[in-house]
């Protein structure tokens, strides 16, 4: 029975470390000259690597707005066809350094933060490639529910160059896709 507190403490320590890495993966370059105000608004999730907190969701969007404390509000929303209902989670994000560098930490659960790193972004802020704290988390985002094949190939090329396995992408069902 004395083992249970030790296992609980080790698990808690692991979760704090695993969920608190706000840095990009080693060797991944984030966008510089980032303008958070231009990034605000709604983005459609075009593709993602599979993970439990979005598993099975379609019509996924992420909406960003400014917080009074200088951070960003984050509202992620997706439709769960198995349950026939919308699911939504609200979080907050803060820059890990200069606000002109697109490296943020984001939290949807209390004091636990993970990395949110914009690694590709077109000049018009229409398409973005975002990764988490390691190469297991990657998203293609767009201001519209669909993207051209040219944009898709550009994003796949950047992801491959940055060391991501693009065969892991799940292409999200969006209106018109």
From Swiss-Prot:
It comes from the Bacteria. It is a lipid-anchor. GO terms for cellular component: cell outer membrane. A lipid is attached at residue 19 (N-palmitoyl cysteine). Keywords: Cell outer membrane, Lipid-binding, Lipoprotein, Membrane, Palmitate, Signal. Pfam families: Lipocalin_2. This is Outer membrane lipoprotein Blc. It comes from Escherichia coli (strain K12). The gene is blc.
């Amino acid at each position: 029975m004395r083992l249970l507190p030790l296992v609980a403490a080790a698990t808690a320590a692991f979760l704090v470390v695993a969920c608190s890495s706000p840095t990009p993966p080693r060797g991944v370059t984030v966008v510089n000259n980032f303008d958070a105000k231009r990034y605000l608004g709604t983005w459609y999730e075009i593709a993602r690597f599979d993970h439990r907190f979005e598993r099975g969701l379609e019509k996924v969007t992420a909406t960003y707005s400014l917080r009074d404390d200088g951070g960003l509000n984050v509202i992620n929303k997706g439709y769960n066809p198995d349950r026939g209902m919308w699911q939504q989670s609200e979080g907050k994000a803060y820059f890990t350094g200069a606000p002109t560098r697109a490296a943020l930490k984001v939290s949807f659960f209390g004091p636990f933060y993970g990395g949110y790193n914009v690694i590709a972004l077109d000049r018009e802020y229409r398409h973005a490639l975002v990764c988490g704290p390691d190469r297991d988390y990657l998203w293609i985002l767009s201001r519209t529910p669909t993207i051209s094949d040219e944009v898709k190939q550009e994003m796949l090329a950047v992801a491959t160059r940055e060391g991501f396995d693009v065969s892991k992408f799940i292409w999200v069902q969006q209106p018109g896709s």
